[in-house]
Amino acid sequence: MKDIEIAQQVTPEPITAIAAKAGLTVDQIDQYGSTKAKLKLPLPVKKTQRNLILVTSINPTPAGEGKSTVTIGLGDALTKIGKSTMIALREPSLGPVMGMKGGATGGGYSQVIPMEDINLHFTGDMHALTAANNTLAALIDNHIQQGNQLGIDQRRIQWKRALDINDRALRHTVIGLGGATSGVPREDGFDITVASELMAILCLSENIADLKQRVNRIVIGYTHDRQPVTVADLNVGGAITLLLKDALRPNLVQTLAHTPALVHGGPFANIAHGCNSVLATQAGLNLADYTVTEAGFGADLGGQKFMDINVPAVGQAPNAVVIVATIRALKLHGGVALQDLATENVAALKAGAANLGHHIHAMQRYGVPVVVAINEFTADTDAEIHAVKDYCADLGVDAVLADVWGRGGDGATDLAAAVVDLCAQPSHFQPLSPADADLKTKINDIVTKTYGGANVEYSAKAQRQLRTFAKQGWDHLPVCMAKTQYSLSDDPKRLGAPTGFTINVREFVPKLGAGFIVALTGNVLTMPGLPKHPAALDMDISDDGKISGLF
C-alpha cells in the first residue's frame, strides 16, 4: 500500500486523548478540529528525565533516506518498550510536497497524522510566516514611496518577498513598474518561506517578548552611507510579531500508533538551520522522559547546526545521536548509478561507507554517544547489511537494523533499546568552536572538522562583507552554512568522503534577528525550482473529498 492509503486506514484518537497521554489538560491546548491542537504558552513543566535524542543522517540520495520515518518509528518503539516519549518534527513546506518529495510526514507504518492536513495547510503556520514576511516587504517599499525618511538605499535592500512553493521564475524580479503611483522601481526576488529569517526567528524564540525583540533586530537593508536599517527603525516590529502570535505555539498531533508528536517550524537544513522549533523541543523535554527530534539532511548540515545553533537555544545537548544510513545511499557514495542501487554491490557499499564513517566522527567530535540506524529497504541483502554492521563495529559504534516503514515501532525496538542504553551513558558535550571565535574561525572549523575540507575561499564580496561585519560588531555571531546536502563539499556531484577540497563562500546574509550569519557556498539557492515531473502531477482529490498522491 501507498503511504497515504496506510494513513487513511488508521482512525486517529481524539487530540484531547493524545494531549492527556502527554500530561496536558484540555485547558492547556487549543483544538484545531478533532485531530490537531496548539499548545498554550507558557509551556507546562513536569518532572521528567529530559533525555534528548537527535536523529540525523549521512549525505542523502535525492529521494531522502527516511530520517523522519526513523524518527517517528523510534518514538513509537520507545513508547512500545514502556518509555514516556514525545516526538518533535519540522512541519512540511508545500515546495517539496508539490515538488520532489510529495510529502514529509514519514512513511509506511511510521507516519504522523492527519498526514493530508500536515502536508498541506496544517494549522496555517506557513501562511502566517509568508504573510508576515510579505507585510514587512510591503512596508519597506511603502516607506521608500512615502519619502524614505530613513534614507534606505533601494539597491541594498536584502529583505526579499517569500512564497511557500518552489518557483524559480521568482528568484529575480523587478518591482515598482507602472509609474509614480506604483512605487519605486527596484530589483527584488523571492525566497521560499522556509528560508525566510522569520522562520528561523520563530523556531529560535522562547516567547512573544523574545519573538518581538528578534523581529526588531532584523536588518532589512542599508542606507546610502551603508548603515544598517532594522525593523525597529521602521517601527513595524509589533505589527509583524502579532501576525506570528499563534504560529509561535507548537502543534500537537499523533503517530499512527498514537504517540504524541509536536510538529512545528520547518527551516530547510541546506539553506537555513534545519531544526524544528525550540519551543517544541522544550515542550517534549518538559512532558516526556524521551524526546526524539530530527535535524534536516546529513550530520554535516542539520546535525552540525543543531549542535552549534539549536543546543544553546534549547539549553540542552542531545543525550544520544542516531545517524540514519541506507544501503542504497552508501552504494551511491561508492560509485553506483542511481538506476542500479537496487542491485547487490558489497564492494561499492564498503567504498561508500567512508561517508558514514565521516558523519560518525563528526558527531562524536561533540562528545555525545552515537548509534547507527540502518533504515531497511526491500532490496537490501544480508551481505550488505552485515557489511555495514561490520564497518561500524570496527569504529566501535553499534549499527542496528530498523524496519520502520514496514513494521512501525515494532521494527525499531532494538534501536530503541540501544538508544536507552546510550542515554544512560555520560555525555560530554562541547561545541565545535568557542562562542567568542570570529566568523572565519567558525567557518574554518566547520569546513575542516565537520566537512573534512582543507581550505575556505571567500569571494571579493564576501571579504568586503566580513570587514563590514567587524565594524558593526557582528563578526562573532554563530554561522549558518548554506551548502548542498548531497556532498560533504560544496559540489553536489562529489560524493563519498572527499578530502583536501576547498569550500567557496560567495556571499554572507546577516540574520541578526535569528542571531546568526548565513554563509552562502557554491551554487546553493534560497528559492528552489520544481523538478521535471513534480509530485503535484500525481495528486488528486475525488468527488467525495478523498485525497490521493501524497506520500
Curated annotation (Swiss-Prot):
InterPro entries: Formate_THF_ligase, Formate_THF_ligase_CS, P-loop_NTPase
Record carries keyword Transcription regulation: no
Catalytic activity, reaction form: (6S)-5,6,7,8-tetrahydrofolate + formate + ATP = (6R)-10-formyltetrahydrofolate + ADP + phosphate
Domain of life of the source: Bacteria
Annotated keywords: ATP-binding, Ligase, Nucleotide-binding, One-carbon metabolism
GO MF entries: ATP binding; formate-tetrahydrofolate ligase activity
Residues holding ATP: 61-68
GO biological process: tetrahydrofolate interconversion
E.C. number(s) listed in UniProt: 6.3.4.3
Gene3D superfamilies in the record: Domain 2, N(10)-formyltetrahydrofolate synthetase, Formyltetrahydrofolate synthetase, domain 3, P-loop containing nucleotide triphosphate hydrolases
One Pfam family recorded for the sequence: FTHFS
Pathway info: One-carbon metabolism; tetrahydrofolate interconversion
Similarity section: Belongs to the formate--tetrahydrofolate ligase family.
NCBIfam families: PRK13505.1 (NF010030)
Name of protein: Formate--tetrahydrofolate ligase
Organism, as annotated: Lactiplantibacillus plantarum (strain ATCC BAA-793 / NCIMB 8826 / WCFS1)
Gene: fhs
